[in-house]
UniProtKB/Swiss-Prot annotation:
Annotated positions binding Fe cation: H120, H124, D310
Localization per Swiss-Prot or TrEMBL: Cytoplasm
Keyword line: Acyltransferase, Cytoplasm, Iron, Metal-binding, Transferase, tRNA processing
Naturally occurring in which organism (per UniProt): Bacillus cereus (strain ATCC 14579 / DSM 31 / CCUG 7414 / JCM 2152 / NBRC 15305 / NCIMB 9373 / NCTC 2599 / NRRL B-3711)
Gene: tsaD
Protein name: tRNA N6-adenosine threonylcarbamoyltransferase
InterPro entries for this protein: ATPase_NBD (IPR043129), Gcp-like_dom (IPR000905), KAE1/TsaD (IPR017861), Peptidase_M22_CS (IPR017860), TsaD (IPR022450)
Residues binding substrate: V142, V143, S144, G145, G146, D175, G188, D192, N281
Amino acid sequence: MGEYIMEKNTIILGIETSCDETAVAVVKNGTEIIANVVASQIESHKRFGGVVPEIASRHHVEEITVVLEEALKEANITFDDIDAIAVTEGPGLVGALLIGVNAAKAVAFAHDIPLVGVHHIAGHIYANRLVKEVQFPLLSLVVSGGHTELVYMKEHGSFEVIGETRDDAAGEAYDKVARTLSMPYPGGPHIDRLAHEGEPTIDLPRAWLEPDSYDFSFSGLKSAVINTVHNAKQRGIEIAPEDLAASFQESVIDVLVTKAARAAEAYNVKQLLLAGGVAANKGLRARLEEEFAQKENIELIIPPLSLCTDNAAMIAAAGTIAYEQGKRATLALNANPGLDIEA
């Protein structure tokens, strides 16, 4: 009988502070969540109708050590058990990113633990690996407040952006349309809920762009919604907000799903991964499931709602791959709000 050697588990501590969530997680072998703690600031930003960078940074300062201690306690481990610390280095709000990066550097230095920098969007993509093992080549549809892109991966750690937004990200368009309809921040979940009560009876544009393009554009759609509301007001016509929400949502989802499906076929991928905060959208999830149910050769992976919005488990998952590939950051690691995923 061959000798069985027990492989050592890789334990990664993830830290995420790119926007308005202070998050720390512990992940084993890149696939198993041991602890996942998130302190959200939505209530603090609600009255301003969006994230205020200065307020976000202050909250991160207050929360980071508390969340870090809570994650270690939940995972029932000490710093001695950790193989590496993975932290979001960008993109995001520079003041917010700095809190996480500096916390990660302090812990790495104090306990002599290797440090790995992670791209926030790589994290969103790797959230899917916490659900199911990924198979290459794959395509990820990334839809969040600041990003809307199609990312092709031929192997671990390799990211090729084959389509991206030329103006507003889908999440931005959701928030701006929600504001037009006098809905609270964040607008996405409110529009999603309202859309399910209405019918898409209002004719709104869809930006298909050039025939072979996988890029997106949502600024025209956003303007069309705002104009529709203003014109109706001026003419004294009542527009049902639920119908407007349904029409807007259908326009966004139609373009996202059609382009993702077209790209998945063209690039002959094995899986399509949904990623990012807007991945929590029920309408988008349902439409993707419907579209990919007919494609027997492409597996659709959709993360649970808790892994769609910003969290640190996804950063630890992406960080595991970087760590295993021998990537290391020095203590000179800095926040990079404009970090490129293809770099």
